[in-house]
């Protein structure tokens, strides 16, 4: 046996007991509201096209696939859950493992627990209120505040993110000592994300959760564009005590528009030298068949448990981090 083997869990046992209590509380929250718990696959023949997400890939070589079938570990259960919604399942939630081949650190582990739920007939604001209710129940925190993406930039960086050009964004980046990154970045949305991460996030959600809504339309992902202001998407995120907790959408239901967005993502991936990803045609077929008007959100459970315990790192709240797996 290796003398360097680390068999012990990364989280203390009392923390795992608290984690179990949080998971039970989450399930109780949705059961009390009549939301169905579902399970969907951890692997799929298609994956996300988002240029900022990196999935794990494997190959199935079982019966009927001697040449190998490419499969991807799911970065979230979103696509399968939307197929259930299109089939008429009604409001649903899921607690599941998700996988991202990205960073590892205080707030990240390649394998993590996701809470995702969808509400037919909910707009973005009604879902924000439900996320707020859940956080108050689980974390016993104050009611959240809400700021638009534009308001957050204007308050903390004194710039309008919806109208500023790349030169103006680089000027703000210089004030944050980020010129070494910003000066060579040509993608406007990447510049905005850099400024948001370094110049806005540290100042929000300190005493109570903060919802940021109406992200730029160019960052819509799978969200609808606002009918009142076509510059913004009906997308929101929530932050608390320096941690991003959730990302939600008033979901796009137009299959043609969704295909165009996937294709645009793949063009961006090609321009950056990243592999183009297979588009999920099953999802597009579900949208074509009729996804009900709905809003949905994905929330990082491990991070919620961190906040419930006052933990400093994700390793304190999961049994085995990847370096001990």
From Swiss-Prot:
Upper classification of the organism: Bacteria, Pseudomonadati, Pseudomonadota, Gammaproteobacteria, Enterobacterales
Source taxon at top rank: Bacteria
Protein name as catalogued: Elongation factor P--(R)-beta-lysine ligase
A molecular function (GO) term: tRNA binding
Substrates-to-products reaction catalysed: D-beta-lysine + L-lysyl-[protein] + ATP = N(6)-((3R)-3,6-diaminohexanoyl)-L-lysyl-[protein] + AMP + diphosphate + H(+)
UniProt-annotated binding residues for substrate: 76-78, 118, 251
Binding partners and assembly: Homodimer.
Cellular component annotations (GO), alphabetically ordered: cytosol
PANTHER family according to UniProt: ELONGATION FACTOR P--(R)-BETA-LYSINE LIGASE, LYSYL-TRNA SYNTHETASE
Swiss-Prot/TrEMBL keywords: ATP-binding, Ligase, Nucleotide-binding
Top EC class of this enzyme: ligase
Binding-site list for ATP: 100-102, 109, 244-245, 300
Keyword check for Ligase: yes
Function per UniProt: With EpmB is involved in the beta-lysylation step of the post-translational modification of translation elongation factor P (EF-P). Catalyzes the ATP-dependent activation of (R)-beta-lysine produced by EpmB, forming a lysyl-adenylate, from which the beta-lysyl moiety is then transferred to the epsilon-amino group of a conserved specific lysine residue in EF-P.
GN (gene name): epmA
Species for this entry: Klebsiella pneumoniae subsp. pneumoniae (strain ATCC 700721 / MGH 78578)
UniProt cross-references to PROSITE patterns, sorted A to Z: AA_TRNA_LIGASE_II
Family in the record: Belongs to the class-II aminoacyl-tRNA synthetase family. EpmA subfamily.
GO biological process per UniProt: lysyl-tRNA aminoacylation
Alphabetical list of HAMAP family matching this protein: EF_P_modif_A (MF_00174)
Enzyme Commission number(s) of this protein: 6.3.2.-
Presence of the UniProt keyword ATP-binding in the record: yes
